[in-house]
Amino acid sequence: MKSTVEQLSPTRVRINVEVPFEELKPDFDKAYKALAQQIRLPGFRPGKAPAKLLEARVGRGAVLEQVVNDALPSRYSEAVTSASVKAIGQPEIEITKIEDGELLEFTAEVDVRPEITLPDYSELSVTVDPIEITDEAVEEQLLSLRQRFGTLTGVERAVEDGDFISIDLSATVDGEAVPEATASGLSHEVGSGQLIEGLDEAVVGVKAGESKEFTSTLVAGDHAGKEAVVTVTVGTVKERELPAEDDEFAQLASEFDTLDELKADLRERVGRVRKVEQAGQIRDKVLETLLETVEVPLPEAVVKAEVDAALHDAVHGLDHDEDALNKLLEEQGTSREEFDKDAKDSAERSVKTQLLLDAIADASDVTVGQDELTERILFQAQRYGMAPEQFIQQIQQAGQLGAVFADVRRGKALAGVVEQATVTDTSGASVDTAELFGNGEADTEEAASTDEVASDSAEGEDQK
C-alpha cells in the first residue's frame, strides 16, 4: 500500500491511498466466507461453496463492494499511522478508482491537530486577588453551621423570606391544565429559588390555607417556553430557630469544647478554601493569557460538532423543538442569532483550549498514571452522587473514559505552565505557585466551596 499526504490547510489534510489487489486477498477471503454462510448452493455444505460459484450467484460487483467497504477503515487507519497524521474527527472518504484485479485508490480528507508555536512560559505573568480571611467570612460559616442545627417551628402568620413551607402547585396554559406542572405537598425554603421562577415572590405575605396566582414560563414538557398561570396554595408555615452561639453549641456541632476553638477551626478552613479559590483564579488567568497570546488554527468541522452538540443540549428538554427554543430565548430577552453566536464563540474557545493544552502536554511529555486517573474518576463519581463502579460503567458505555484521561492530562499540562509563570497579588506580593500546584494538578474542581466549610466542621463531630 502507498499513501501520500496533502496539506489542505493548517487544520486539514487529504490522504491519497493506493492499495494493490494482492493486498486485498484477506478481505476477499473474508467476504467469500461470509457469503458462503449466507448462500446455500446445491451439492455443497453450508460454508463450503467455492468462491467462483458464489461470485456467479451474487455478481462480481457485489463482492467488490463488500471487500472495498470492509477494507477502507483499516487501510485508512494504516495510512494515518504510517504518515503520523494527528487526525481528529471523522474522515470524508471518496473512492477514486477501482481497477478490478489491479488497484484500489481512495482519498480521505480529515481535520488534524495544527502545529502550534508555544511561548516561553517563564515570561508569562498574571496578577490575582490576595488571600483574605475576614471575621465576616468566619461568621458566615458559623451561621451556616447554626442553620444546619436549627429547628423548625410552626408559626401562625404570613409567609416571610427564609420560612419553610409546604405547598400545592397547579398550572394552566391558555386555560388548559398542565398535568406535569401539578404537585402536592412540596417542601420549599422561601428565597432559595429552587422551584419555579416567581414562586418566592408570590408566596411572601400569604398565610397557611391561602392561595395565590402568578405567571411563569415553563421550561420543560409539552408546554416548554410557554407562559403559564400558576396557582400556589400554602399548607404549613415554619420558621427556623437557630441555636445560641456558645460553648454548648460548639460541643453539639463539632469536635471542639469551646466556641473559640470552633471559630479558629472555621478560620483555618476558610483559609484553605481561599487558597483553592486563588489557585483557580491563577489557573484561569494563566490560561486566558495563553489563549490571548498563542495562535491556534481551528478545525472547522470540530468546531461545528461542538456547536451542534450545544444546540442538541438546548433543545433536548424542549422535545427537540427549535421553534420552542426560539420562543424561550425571545421571552428571556435574547434571540436565536445571539444564541448561535454564543454557541460558536464557546465552541471555538473550547476547541482552542483543548488543542493548546494538548500541544503543551505533548511538548512537555505529560503522562497520566493509573492512580491519577482513578482519583479523578472517584472524585467525579462522588460529585454526581454515584457509586464508583456505576460511574465507571456509565462512562465506559458512553465512550468517555478517554475524555476523562484527556482532562487530567490537560490539567497537569496547565499546572506545569502555572509553576513557571510569575504570579503576584494586587498588593504586590509574590504568590508561591509551587505550594498551590506542586502536585502537578491545576484542577480546582475538587476543592470544597465556602458553603461546605461549616459542613466539614460538623462532620468532625461524627468522629468524636
Swiss-Prot record:
It catalyses: [protein]-peptidylproline (omega=180) = [protein]-peptidylproline (omega=0). PROSITE patterns: FKBP_PPIASE. Residues 162-243 form the PPIase FKBP-type domain. Its EC number is 5.2.1.8. GO terms for biological process: 'de novo' cotranslational protein folding; cell division; chaperone-mediated protein folding; protein transport; protein unfolding. One of its GO terms (cellular component) is cytoplasm. It is found in: Cytoplasm. Residues 428-464 are annotated as: Disordered. Signal peptide: none annotated. InterPro entries: PPIase_dom_sf (IPR046357), PPIase_FKBP_dom (IPR001179), Trig_fac (IPR005215), Trigger_fac_C (IPR008880), Trigger_fac_C_sf (IPR037041), Trigger_fac_ribosome-bd_bac (IPR008881), Trigger_fac_ribosome-bd_sf (IPR036611), Trigger_fact/SurA_dom_sf (IPR027304). Involved in protein export. Acts as a chaperone by maintaining the newly synthesized protein in an open conformation. Functions as a peptidyl-prolyl cis-trans isomerase. HAMAP family: Trigger_factor_Tig. Belongs to the FKBP-type PPIase family. Tig subfamily. Consists of 3 domains; the N-terminus binds the ribosome, the middle domain has PPIase activity, while the C-terminus has intrinsic chaperone activity on its own. This is Trigger factor. It comes from Rhodococcus opacus (strain B4). The lineage of its organism: Bacteria, Bacillati, Actinomycetota, Actinomycetes, Mycobacteriales.
